[in-house]
Amino acid sequence: MAIKKAKRKSNVEEVKTQLLEIKTELKDGVFTFTGPMTINEFSKKIKKQAKDVILHFFKQGKMYNANQIINEEEIAELCLEFDYEFKKEEQITVSNFMDTLVLSDEAKDLEERAPIITVMGHVDHGKTTLIDVIRKSKIVDTEAGGITQHTGAYQIEYNGKKITFIDTPGHEAFTQMRSRGAKVTDIVILVVAADDGVMPQTKEAIDHAKSANVPIIVFVNKMDKPNKDIDRILSALSTLDVVSEEWSGDTQFIYGSALKNQGIDKLFDAINLQAEILELKANRNRDAIGTIIESHLDKGKGSVSVLIVQNGTLTPRDFIVAGSQYGRIRSIEDTNGNSLDAAYPGTPVIVTGLNYVPNAGDRFIALSDESFAKNIAEQKAFVDKQAELISRNTIVVQDGIKVLNIILKADVQGIAEAIKSKLLEIKNEEVKINVVRSSVGAITKSDILLAQASNAIIFGFNIRATGGIKTFAEESRVIVKTHTIIYELLDEVNELLNGLKAPKFKEVVTGEARIKKIFFYSKVGNIAGCEVISGKVTSGTKMRLIRNGITVHEGILDSLQREKNQAREVLKGFEFGTHIKKFNDIKEDDIIQTFEDVQI
């Protein structure tokens, strides 16, 4: 007899709510904004004269005009001056929502989960041998040159408690990969050889752990060696702010030998103690969220990913998004190859079903709304494509710093100068901005040719590129961006510096149909007999059911039936029959409205 699955809390509504676009507006005495703007823009939003705002700054000895860009501190200052409260909001997009997403769980739903451990250390300090002992397998012998070449995840059980381990590579070539590993990690095990001490990768591992605010347990390995120097290790680590408990610090130090299987149980005890202090908990009664640890393409299985569930439960047939990839989970196995019906918080598993290979370090989320999930993944794919285009428009200069070349066009000189000034204030450690040209007027072929020659991106403010110029730019492989709000232009430049720019979409109604009659069919439920009253209705599109002017359901329109034949679309004035997926409560005179999200 099949076990009935408990209903899990969906992630969809929380994601949709947090992806809502933040509006700059004054509402109920609170001014909400996302970044800098001109005095003119601020004045319009609060329905004041620009001269009143200019006067405020004049009294401070600042000679501002209506085109002056004011920063966040000045906006806050003005709000206080005009007796408004203010609120600075971060704009959340598909580019960053997985990093900022907040999932709410009630305390009663939370239960203890397995800690996730990353083992780090300098090459040849015995990190892989320690992992080998933990896994009770012989992965060491199969690795090239004795150095781990990939990231894996494994789970063991000690004293009735599960512990998950991530094995991150231990040398400089994989520093970025190791950094990704720290994002999912609860505790870092830092392996230091007793006969070698603190080395370059030891310091890097400490930096990664501290930047991720992850506690460290030090495993001093190779204690069986005759030439060990423990005091030197304790002293060197203390200068890196890793101070042992025996030196009145708060870091646990375990002494042992992975090769001799010594100190391993003490290490497990230390992990369980640290996990208790951290109070690691999760809600298994919700849809899953977690991190991709590694992935590859298998000829027989397609995309195969090793992932760790950090919250919720993952089951076969769940639809997930991981970076710009998506798909329905076909199979779940533990890291020993055993088939699983479900993966719970803290569990590493191997899954198949994604449309392509996600990146190691990508966050994943299960979304029960398949259409919404695909939309997010497709937008993220667009972001990635833009990032690739942007990378082609950067020049690597001395010391590895990249330059983003920009050609700026605006409708008036004052605005052009103000935007240029703000652009040059933008700080980024890896990329700097170079304004190749700043001028007034429409975008011309001369601008396109200069952009092509200098690998620049063209930004226009309060101007439009004509059809001919757009075509010429596309043929020349030059990116042209236009804006009418300054802070949006600045925000986009900031995103471009990180290789990110999410596309904007608007909803377009494609058709409406009135339900004239309802038929019942035992295999599917209610069938709606409809007539198209405007536009056209297409099968498989998004739809909403409207009753007396109120939306009562949103979903997907199933296949369309005209007489005895299936139809892809039905035009105005024609009749058809259809079924609304997972919804039966339809009535005569209800309106079926179909729509699609169109990129702006």
From Swiss-Prot:
Please, which domain of life does this record's source organism belong to?
A: Bacteria
Q: Where is this region: G3?
A: 167-170
Could you tell me which Gene3D superfamilies the record lists for this protein? P-loop containing nucleotide triphosphate hydrolases (3.40.50.300), Translation factors (2.40.30.10), Translation initiation factor IF- 2, domain 3 (3.40.50.10050)
Instruction: Tell me which family the UniProt entry assigns to this protein.
Output: Belongs to the TRAFAC class translation factor GTPase superfamily. Classic translation factor GTPase family. IF-2 subfamily.
Task: List the Pfam families.
Answer: EF-G_D2, GTP_EFTU, IF-2, IF2_N
Q: Which gene encodes it?
A: infB
- Residue ranges of region G5? 257-259
The ranges of region (G2) come to 146-150
Where does it reside? Answer: Cytoplasm
Tell me which stretches of the chain form a coiled coil: none
Q: Where is this region: G4?
A: 221-224
Supply the alphabetized keyword list: Cytoplasm, GTP-binding, Initiation factor, Nucleotide-binding, Protein biosynthesis
- Organism expressing this protein natively: Mycoplasma mobile (strain ATCC 43663 / 163K / NCTC 11711)
Role summary: One of the essential components for the initiation of protein synthesis. Protects formylmethionyl-tRNA from spontaneous hydrolysis and promotes its binding to the 30S ribosomal subunits. Also involved in the hydrolysis of GTP during the formation of the 70S ribosomal complex.
Mind telling me which GO cellular component terms the entry cites? cytosol
> What residue spans carry the region label G1?
121-128
Report the HAMAP family cross-referenced here.
IF_2_B
> Which GO terms of the molecular function aspect are on file?
GTP binding; GTPase activity; translation initiation factor activity
Protein's UniProt name = Translation initiation factor IF-2
Q: Which residues bind GTP?
A: 121-128, 167-171, 221-224
Q: Which InterPro entries match?
A: EF-G-like_DII, IF2_II, IF2_N, P-loop_NTPase, Small_GTP-bd, T_Tr_GTP-bd_dom, TF_IF2_bacterial-like, TIF_IF2
